Amino acid sequence: MAAANWRTLKKLDAHIPILPDAVHTANPDSEDVWVYADLRQYVQIMRENHIERAVIMPFNDPFLMSMEFTAGAVHRNLAEMKRRYPGRFYAFADIDVRNSRAETVDALCRAIDDHALDGIKLHPNNSGLALDSDYNCAIFAFAQERRVPVAVHSYPNAEDDLSAAKRIVKTAEEAAEIAYENAVALLG
């Protein structure tokens, strides 16, 4: 069997950070890497590289994904990005650890019900919360109840890291229904 040509092979990008236009507009002099996290630029990259769909992932830091600095604003921005390019993007809901567990679960419910977001993104190193914390366990319980996938951004560097392998295994075992039926994606 001949090897596939990577350029023409159809692809799914499972983890792309894209900043909303409002953030780019508010920071016109930005010269960091995020200046390239632009939706229109990325759609062109998708066309050039036969990326059929992509998953837009937030950061668990609403200061990067909105100018209102709330999870609700992030969710509206993510929904708008999906709306602009129907059928091209999935988008995962964000969390804001400044909110209580109950407020976060309510925000996730609205993100899925009102904004048609497709899953939940957890980034323990950005949120400062261990993957197996009570806070995140409430999120996993919600995801299991609602049958939505959870993506975990993980780059554990130490045994006790917030996203250490033992925490991932423990969480996957405790949320086995999600892990095996709805998929827990590990990103890193």
Model segments located where?
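Acidic-enriched, low-complexity/disordered segments with a strong bias for Aspartate over Glutamate
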Residues: 13, 21, 29-32, 38, ...
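Active-site micro-motifs of SAM-dependent methyltransferase domains
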Residues: 18-20, 61, 97, 127, ...
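Active-site gating/metal-coordination segments in enzymes
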Residues: 68-157
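Mid-to-C-terminal alpha-helical segments outside catalytic/metal-binding sites
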Residues: 1-14, 18, 23-53, 158-188
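Divalent metal-dependent hydrolysis catalytic cores, especially in the metallo-beta-lactamase
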Residues: 29-66, 88-96, 118-119, 125
